[in-house]
């Protein structure tokens, strides 16, 4: 439940440190509290007949156990800014007397007495302070001034009596990220308190002390991070006997650089918070101490021993199942049974891995993934294969480092390389990779000399058709990107006869000015291929409607056919446009498209804010071939496999299933007209070979997914969160028959990439 946690009206007044008044809300409940359509309102301490409530509308939500900061009017004095507020208004609160209400709705209240306000069902919570006549309970909260706020007592006390529930003290504004104002933290503790880290962490994912201030928590500093989410980790050198309770915790210092050092013995006073790095995306939370006051007792102390994470102690089952539609947050941790519980029981503690294989290359954020469990299904080139929703690979672990890369270069690793020796550091949680080892010491990098693949040389009688997602290619990209992509087409793909491209942007890239033409983008790429020794490709495409096909805003990404006119001809049939639906005409050998190029059912709801399939009719040695270039909707909005929701929701899957159903019906219509039709459907389908979308595409055998015909260890085209997986596919109709298919691994496993997808090529004999 949401309550008003703190009120301060002295901002910018004489003697004040803070520049602004503020109202701080808190969520005492176990679920998010939505604030859309709500408001905070203020009225003077002694309202008259003409007094009006001032209103600040709110948006968003308060995650369980966190705060929500509303900045109000600024005064002329003060030297310290509030932490970044979650909402802002212009209410000028009195420093000594007034009333604040949390209201369902944004219409001003009309009540001016305590009784009338108590009777108004829109009022969720109310705080009167100073001599305010509108308050909860026997009296208003006392002690507010230019240097003192009124804040709820321990546990966010809420007995509906302002005088009893709130007390005056130094203002301590805290936002939803747990950030506090500079200089607003109290003096460090001098004696250990009664609460230990394992008491804070508890035996579930959420601390039972969330929202409470804990004093004098002892620990040894095991890691310090001075960039990004700044702070440090502490660990109790005297653990309890419960394997479910972590002995480590992150201390969040907000915008302030931490001043402690690894090996310091410290006492920390701070507020227990649960920080969700991606709440709306379903992430789990990180238990942390915010707004800390720290006392260093001694330095140079030995660190608590690191827990080695490996095949011996990582459970084989990834996660417990939550109640229908619910989360695993309240379930007791079973670290011996479930992988996610095992990692949660080590949250904030020192862990280590030894001689681990890199399963996702170093990225631009200076992070990589390793395989802590050597039993996960290995790909042919050293990654781990994602083969089903039920088997997400338990040993995947992200590795970052505590030191900034400018201070300590991060290893540039490819898949299959090895971090030899020991890599150790605290176990963190973030919204991009889940549980993450933030290394203080990194193992030495052993280069496995991974080579970029080159597809087989085709025979002259083979038609080669390829697909390549070129990742938002636009004329303004560096010439080096065009050159690298082009060289791959010529060398690694051996200049395919037909090349279906995805993510070709319009002529001015990600600029929203109505431009949809991509002729300059394509011309620059075609020229780069020719310069790299490739053929003089011709091309066909259809410009989308502005802003209707998703992707990077302003970019208007689309699919494009490149084809080598010396090897294959394109059958141009007028009538194709962004909004016109292609159909099938004729029967038997006379079967043809009604437009070439054309788009499949562009007005169907399946393609809302997504790329429509581009279909073209080609001729190779007198044989007709229909090619469909695809780019299905992305997985944006899906909950991660490490989500607090188990099983995680795959909301984007619904649209891809609709898209697959529409396309399958089109192919079925082609085959009904000509059962011997040669159809190749390929591209970035943004889904797995075991997904409902691919099952729908291959329904009734109208298409077969060639990735399933590769050796199991070669079935991947993309690497995400340490999983080598299939997002790109080539599918063919039954009469294609002979089909030699290859995923050409040149990008996804490498730190240096021209694109994040691997291209694919198929050789057929129409």
Segments predicted by a language model, with ranges:
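Long, well-ordered early-domain segments
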Residues: 74, 97, 101-105, 116, ...
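Acidic, glycine-rich loop-and-strand cores that form catalytic or ligand-binding grooves
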Residues: 92-133, 349, 353-378, 693-713, ...
């Amino acid at each position: 439940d949401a309550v008003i946690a703190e009120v301060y009206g002295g901002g910018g007044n004489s003697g004040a440190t803070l520049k602004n008044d503020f109202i701080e809300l808190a969520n005492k409940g176990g679920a998010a509290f939505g604030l859309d359509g709500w408001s905070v309102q203020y009225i003077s301490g002694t309202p008259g007949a003409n007094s009006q409530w001032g209103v600040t509308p709110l948006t968003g939500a308060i995650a369980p156990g966190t705060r929500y900061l509303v900045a109000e009017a600024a005064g002329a004095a003060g030297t310290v800014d509030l932490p970044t507020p979650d909402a802002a208004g212009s209410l000028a609160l009195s420093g000594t007397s007034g009333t604040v209400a949390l209201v369902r709705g944004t219409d001003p209240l009309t009540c001016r007495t305590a009784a009338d306000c108590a009777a108004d069902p829109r009022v969720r919570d109310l705080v009167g302070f100073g001599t305010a006549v509108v308050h909860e309970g026997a009296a208003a909260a006392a002690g507010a001034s230019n240097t003192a706020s009124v804040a709820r007592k321990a546990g966010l006390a809420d007995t509906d009596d302002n005088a009893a529930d709130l007390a005056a003290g130094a203002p301590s504004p805290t936002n939803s990220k747990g950030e506090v104002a500079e200089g607003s933290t109290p003096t460090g503790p001098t004696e250990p308190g009664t609460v230990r880290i394992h008491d804070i962490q508890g035996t579930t994912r959420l601390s039972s002390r969330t929202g409470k201030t804990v004093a004098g928590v002892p620990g040894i500093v095991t890691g310090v991070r001075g960039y990004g989410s700044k702070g440090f980790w502490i660990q109790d050198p005297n653990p309890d006997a419960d394997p479910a309770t972590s002995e480590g915790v992150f201390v969040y210092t907000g915008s302030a650089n931490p001043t402690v050092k690894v090996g310091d013995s410290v006492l920390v006073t701070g507020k227990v918070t649960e920080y969700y790095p991606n709440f709306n995306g379903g992430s789990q939370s990180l238990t942390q101490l915010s707004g800390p006051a720290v006392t260093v007792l001694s330095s140079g102390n030995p660190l608590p021993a690191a827990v080695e994470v490996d095949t011996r102690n990582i459970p084989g089952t990834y996660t417990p199942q939550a109640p229908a539609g619910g989360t695993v947050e309240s379930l007791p941790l079973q670290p011996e049974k479930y992988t996610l519980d095992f990692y949660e029981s080590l949250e904030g503690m020192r862990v280590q891995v030894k001689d681990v294989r890199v399963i996702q290359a170093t990225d631009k954020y200076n992070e990589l993934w390793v395989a802590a469990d050597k039993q996960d299904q290995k790909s042919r080139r050293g990654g781990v294969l994602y083969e089903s929703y039920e088997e997400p690979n338990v040993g995947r672990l992200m590795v970052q480092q505590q030191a900034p890369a400018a201070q300590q270069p991060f290893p540039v690793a490819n898949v299959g390389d090895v971090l030899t020796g020991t890599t150790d550091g605290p176990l963190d949680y973030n919204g991009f990779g889940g549980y993450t080892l933030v290394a203080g010491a990194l193992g030495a990098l052993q280069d496995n000399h991974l080579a970029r693949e080159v597809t087989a040389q085709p025979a002259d009688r083979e038609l080669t058709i390829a697909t390549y997602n070129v990742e938002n290619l636009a004329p303004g990209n560096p010439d080096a990107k065009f050159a690298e992509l082009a060289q791959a087409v010529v060398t690694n793909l051996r200049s395919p006869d037909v090349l279906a491209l995805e993510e070709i942007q319009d002529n001015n890239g990600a600029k929203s000015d109505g431009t949809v033409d991509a002729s300059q983008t394509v011309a620059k790429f075609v020229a780069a291929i020719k310069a790299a020794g490739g053929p003089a490709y011709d091309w066909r495409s259809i410009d989308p409607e502005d802003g209707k096909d998703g992707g990077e805003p302003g970019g208007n990404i689309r699919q494009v056919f490149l084809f080598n006119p010396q090897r294959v001809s394109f059958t141009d049939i007028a009538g194709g446009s962004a909004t016109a639906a292609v159909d099938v005409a004729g029967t038997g050998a006379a079967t043809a498209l009604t437009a070439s190029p054309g788009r499949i059912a562009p007005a169907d709801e399946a393609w809302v804010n997504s790329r429509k399939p581009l279909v073209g009719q080609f001729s190779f040695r007198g044989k007709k071939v229909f090619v469909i270039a695809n780019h299905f909707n992305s997985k944006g909005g899906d909950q991660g496999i490490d989500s607090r929701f188990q099983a995680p929701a795959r909301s984007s899957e619904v649209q891809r299933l609709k898209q697959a159903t529409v396309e399958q019906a089109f192919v079925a219509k082609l085959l009904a007209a000509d059962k011997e039709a040669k159809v190749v459907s390929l591209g970035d389908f943004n889904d797995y070979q075991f997904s409902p979308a691919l099952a729908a595409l291959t329904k009734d055998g109208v298409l077969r997914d060639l990735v399933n015909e590769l050796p199991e260890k070669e079935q991947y085209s993309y690497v995400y969160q340490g999983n080598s997986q299939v997002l790109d596919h080539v599918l063919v109709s039954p009469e294609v028959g002979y089909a030699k298919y290859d995923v050409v691994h040149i990008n996804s496993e490498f730190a240096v990439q021209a694109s994040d997808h691997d291209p694919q090529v198929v050789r057929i004999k129409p």
